[in-house]
Amino acid sequence: MRIALWLLALFAVAVAAALFAGNNPGSITVFWPPYRVDLSLNLVLVLLLLFFLVLHMAWRALSALFAIPREARLWRLRQRERGMQLALLDAFSNLVAGRFVRAKRAAESVLVQVRSIESAGDKLGYGPRIQAVSHLLAAEAAHSLQDRPGREQHLRAAIDHASAGAAPETREGVQLCAARWALDDRDANLALQLLDDLGQGPGRRTLALRMRLKAARMAKRTVAALETARLLAKHRALSQVAAEGVLRGLAIELVHGAHDPAQLQKAWEQLDIGEQAMADVATEAAERLLELGGDPALSRQWLLPAWEHMVARQTTLTALQRVHLVRTLERGFASVAGAPDAGWLARIESAQLQNPGDPVLQYLAGVTCMRLQLWGKANQLLTQALSRLQDPSLRRDTWRLLAELAEQSGDQLAATQAWRNAAQT
């Protein structure tokens, strides 16, 4: 299409020239005493056109001649840039391939070439950025080689170049790498400081949050680790199962870190409602409260959501979780001030009637009856639960309780047999 348009334009110019020059009788007379030169107007126009063409070509030739040194310098600069970029690719390729010595050597060669270009008077617009990246690759290789002095030297240089004029992403990448190296060195406080220096936006990225979680756990900052894990779960950086496992472990760690009932209650209040409803967290917190001599009624209040879930079967509790929950309630009932109130009596009785075949609930109901000195009812419930209990510790304690009931009623033969069965379980 373009060629056709050019041909049409050429034909138009030819037609216009033919119409103008074909019937043009004009002439130009040049007086140069004692001479007189007569020239046709068409010839003069052709000569002027040729003159301007020659002048233009001469100007182009002179411009090209004087531009040769500059073009040669640009060509050399492009060749150096190409070599520098190839060396940078070699550094990255060797680094991911595990050839750390070669990667470090290639990254350092990039730095040498950049300095050579700048010493020649040329300025690279991306100079600070490529220098920061090269120092970062060299530091990564030195870190893999356990060369800590070399790593720190390249890290400081990378930070300087990243702060001098590189893009913000480069500086953030350098800080993230430095935080990861600090974690590898087991220096959690330095890692947290570097992550704090990132700022609000970069510090909430998934990679930064993962490192913050690891550093907080390493530094035994359970509250900070718990907050970070919540952010990761909110951003869906962890699967639902993994998030629940991490939150559960951190919540239990926070509970175990309390050394008196006041600290434990403060730690419990720092947990979310969902975390408090986790069966493992609730039972561990209630058990820890009883160990510290806390209020048994408060421990049962903490256990109430897990109890309701177990009874209503809204969530599936494992057999171990059910046993742990019942054991914690039993321990609270056994304390001096832990006698079950009317509310818990109604809950246990209702749960046992709704699930008459559940041996764990029968065991708990029997223990509650013993605490209230209802010996006959307790003996009946414990005997019914004994045949279906699978947990060895519950079976052993059931035999022990039956032995105590037999001694209470004066049946020494039954008590002896029950004690023997408890010892054999």
What are these regions (language model features)?
Residues 146-147, 159, 171-180, 315-391:
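Alpha-helical adaptor scaffolds
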Residues 94, 135, 142-143, 182, ...:
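Residue at a conserved register position within TPR or TPR-like alpha-solenoid repeats
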Residues 71-179, 185-190:
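Membrane-proximal, non-transmembrane interface segments of integral membrane proteins
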Residues 90, 131, 138, 178, ...:
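Structural register within alpha-helical repeat arrays
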Residues 108, 149-160, 187-199, 223-235, ...:
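Alpha-helical repeat scaffolds
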Residues 76, 114-128, 161-168, 238-241, ...:
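Flexible helix-coil transition and linker loops at the boundaries of alpha-helical arrays
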Residues 44-75:
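Transmembrane alpha-helices and immediately adjacent membrane-cytoplasm interface residues
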Residues 97, 145-146, 185, 219, ...:
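Structural motif corresponding to the intra-repeat A-B loop/turn of tetratricopeptide repeats
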